[in-house]
Amino acid sequence: MAETKKMIILKSSDGESFEVEEAVAVESQTIKHMIEDDCVDNGIPLPNVTGAILAKVIEYCKKHVEAAAEAGGDKDFYGSTENHELKTWDNDFVKVDHPTLFDLLRAANYLNISGLLDLTCKAVADQMRGKTPAQMREHFNIKNDYTPEEEAEVRNENRWAFE
């Protein structure tokens, strides 16, 4: 007899509903706590996550739950063993445009999914590596709101960072 898996409904900020296995949903500590507090009867509203981003988050969680199951249920397998296929998949997963990457980062933070948060933060850090402050501002479309005097003061106080 086939085992039926408990399903959870997740509702995005733009009204989309996603039916997800509980094992996948609890990759999010935020959702896990809502389930533990019995707050799932009518679905779990996620007001800070759009449907498009929630679909990507679910894809990430599903992939990692499946990979952990293949590794014998060891959730720490990613760091303790060489799982090149998953690492490659993760690297490809964050090859998205800037707005999507930042939305994924915000969703990972809001949903408290540590693996996804680490992955998205690393992707942003990798984009910053080797760039000057001016190049980073241009790359991330950040306005420089320092006066030349303020910028010189910051550079002087933090000389070690500019060497």
UniProtKB/Swiss-Prot annotation:
Q: Which SUPFAM superfamilies does this UniProt record tie to the protein?
A: POZ domain (SSF54695), Skp1 dimerisation domain-like (SSF81382)
Which SMART domains does the UniProt record give?
Answer: Skp1 (SM00512)
Q: Name one GO biological process term.
A: response to auxin
User: Tissue range of expression?
Assistant: Highly expressed in siliques.
What Gene3D superfamilies does this protein map onto?
Potassium Channel Kv1.1, Chain A
The primary location reported for this protein is nucleus
Keyword tags: Nucleus, Ubl conjugation pathway
Spell out the Pfam families in the cross-references.
Answer: Skp1 (PF01466), Skp1_POZ (PF03931)
Provide the Gene Ontology terms for cellular component: nucleus; SCF ubiquitin ligase complex
Which pathway is this protein engaged in?
A: Protein modification; protein ubiquitination
Subcellular localization is given as: Nucleus
Q: Which InterPro entries match?
A: SKP1, SKP1-like, SKP1-like_dim_sf, SKP1/BTB/POZ_sf, Skp1_comp_dimer, Skp1_comp_POZ
Q: Where is this region: Interaction with the F-box domain of F-box proteins?
A: 105-163
Q: Which PANTHER family match?
A: SKP1 (PTHR11165)
- Its biological function? Involved in ubiquitination and subsequent proteasomal degradation of target proteins. Together with CUL1, RBX1 and a F-box protein, it forms a SCF E3 ubiquitin ligase complex. The functional specificity of this complex depends on the type of F-box protein. In the SCF complex, it serves as an adapter that links the F-box protein to CUL1.
Q: How does it assemble?
A: Part of a SCF (SKP1-cullin-F-box) protein ligase complex. Interacts with ADO3/FKF1 and At3g61590.
Tell me which family the UniProt entry assigns to this protein: Belongs to the SKP1 family.
Q: What is the protein named?
A: SKP1-like protein 3
Q: Which organism is it from?
A: Arabidopsis thaliana (Mouse-ear cress)
